[in-house]
Amino acid sequence: MKLSFWGAARVVTGSCHRLTACSKNILIDCGLQQGGDVYNENELFFDATAIDAVCVTHAHTDHSGRLPLLVKNGYKGPIYATRATCDLLKIMLLDSARIQESDAQWKAKKNKRSGDPTEDALYMVQDATDTLELLVPVRPPLSTWL
């Protein structure tokens, strides 16, 4: 068994850990970092297609906010979470995508005036919608096997 820390290692937010066991790669959380755009680059530090399953511990953005980026980068497997977390993610991820798109449009307009290059949104509403289709609600008890 191997545990890799891809987020919340140097800072408190941005929880993202990969557990490798029995030839399977399970991602535990995939969160946004708080503290500015520099922490939320458009790339992941691992191959999204190599992940077999995702478990989201809870709906806070620093534990779930990069799920649409994971899907945008090719992840197509299940995303396990409690029903309550799934319900919140349906609202939060779509809202976050709208904010990402709006921020990218604002920055593009600003950068066009100054001659700086434009940046793409971290992810789009369609990426969030695609992510929601992968949610698999699980019910406690906590001993549920995935």
Question: Across the structure, where does each feature detected by a protein language model lie?
Answer:
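Catalytic core of the metallo-beta-lactamase
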Residues: 2, 16-21, 137-146
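Pre-active-site segment of Zn-dependent metallo-hydrolases
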Residues: 9-11, 21-77, 81-85, 92-130
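Eukaryotic helix-linker segments that join adjacent hydrophobic helices
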Residues: 127-141
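N-terminal metal-binding scaffold of metallo-dependent hydrolase/deaminase domains
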Residues: 1-14
